[in-house]
């Protein structure tokens, strides 16, 4: 189920609803941290508490370069295999996006709680066409309250527990089930 959810969020959310549309409109678009490249010397410093796959393309885009989008690129990713790791990964990524305006005041918000709701409704046809089996349809339905729980939990941790997320390869933020096999 966690692999399906991860594929769904990438295929439908990141690519179908966001990146393809923004690329066609020649707007700023986020890259994926799983595969992106940029010309040496364009970025001097990368903050560790934000989404590097978003801040780096913004720096490049802000210098007048167009961000390319290779729709057919293939990347193999080991997704989380349990709820604890899935939540940890998603909360870390969501929080990293909330901090972007700390570095760039006019940052074009692409990923947010309200953005997920709005674009989920706008792209509802794509959302409902993605599942191929009844089991996948149920997993898709279960994803919505799980994402809501993730956002509520993140908000609670940030506002009331004063928890700060940072670079995922430090502290206890590494997602254990996504580590490669040795």
Tell where the protein language model's regions lie, with residue ranges.
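Broad hydrophobic/π-residue packing in well-ordered secondary structure
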Residues: 38, 43, 65, 69, ...
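Residue-level detector of alpha-helix boundaries and kinks
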Residues: 27-28, 45, 75, 130, ...
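Terminal low-complexity segments of carbohydrate-biosynthetic enzymes
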Residues: 95-182
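Long helical/loop segments within the catalytic core of UDP-sugar-dependent glycosyltransferases
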Residues: 1-44, 87, 91-94
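Residue-identity detector for glycine
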Residues: 3, 13, 33, 41, ...
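Catalytic donor/gating beta->alpha subdomain of glycosyltransferases that bind UDP-sugars
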Residues: 1-5, 9-11, 47-111, 115
